[in-house]
Swiss-Prot record:
Signal peptide: none annotated. It is found in: Secreted. Contains 4 disulfide bonds. It comes from the Eukaryota. Keywords: Disulfide bond, G-protein coupled acetylcholine receptor impairing toxin, G-protein coupled receptor impairing toxin, Neurotoxin, Postsynaptic neurotoxin, Secreted, Toxin. GO terms for molecular function: toxin activity. It comes from Micrurus lemniscatus (South American coral snake). The lineage of its organism: Eukaryota, Metazoa, Chordata, Craniata, Vertebrata. Expressed by the venom gland. Probably blocks muscarinic acetylcholine receptors (CHRM), since it inhibits the binding of the selective muscarinic ligand [3H]QNB and inhibits the carbachol-induced [3H]inositol phosphate accumulation in rat hippocampus. One of its GO terms (cellular component) is extracellular region. Transmembrane segments: none annotated. This is Muscarinic toxin Mlalpha.
């Protein structure tokens, strides 16, 4: 999913 709040490469 695309996360606009977490800008971490591991979060995507």
């Amino acid at each position: 999913l695309i996360c606009f709040i977490c800008f971490s490469p591991t979060a995507h």
